[in-house]
């Protein structure tokens, strides 16, 4: 199982759209799981689904009933086309309380108890142990924009990684600037038929040939 981390220190860069398109493209040939690790994902509205549970419950089972963890995970897993996804955290407070070790344990249990080939991690700054999770990833994609503020933030992020002894994270990171894309469909299941999907295909071609 390989972990693919999608992260950006800037906002409004199509990070989640990129992550979901990547997962949908890979799921045509592989078994893929998408995990949203943001404070507020908005996926419930975008998917027009009323999630009956969320990641907080899965973390609870991870700590208190590990023998039933895979069962509970399977019962709450949803889909976008062929891409599996876990219901994201509903509460920001629940999300930020998850420790780095709990994230690592979650990934280990998924690898041990499922046949997923790839996990797409849609990452954010609020995660405990962000840099260590990025280090754990087999591939990292960082998205940016072409304006001066965005370029400066990416450069600062690079410098912080290097000064914090996470230079290995930067070395395996591929940076892409998403072009301006208009009229993305409201339905996430339609993203693979967009200009964005063609761009993502170009970005990942050499990594997944």
What residue ranges belong to the model's regions?
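Conserved beta-strand segments of the P-loop GTPase G domain that flank and frequently precede/overlap
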Residues: 6-7, 35-36, 87-88, 120-122, ...
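P-loop/Walker-type NTP enzyme "switch/lid" segment
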Residues: 8-10, 37-111
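Walker A/P-loop phosphate-binding motif and the immediately C-terminal alpha-helix
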Residues: 2-39
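Active-site-adjacent loop/helix micro-motif of nuclease/hydrolase catalytic cores
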Residues: 15-16, 95-99, 149-156
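NTP-binding/hydrolysis catalytic cores, primarily Walker-type P-loop NTPases
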Residues: 186-209
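Hydrophobic/aromatic beta-strand patches that form the interior of the parallel beta-sheet core
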Residues: 4, 33-35, 84-86, 139-141, ...
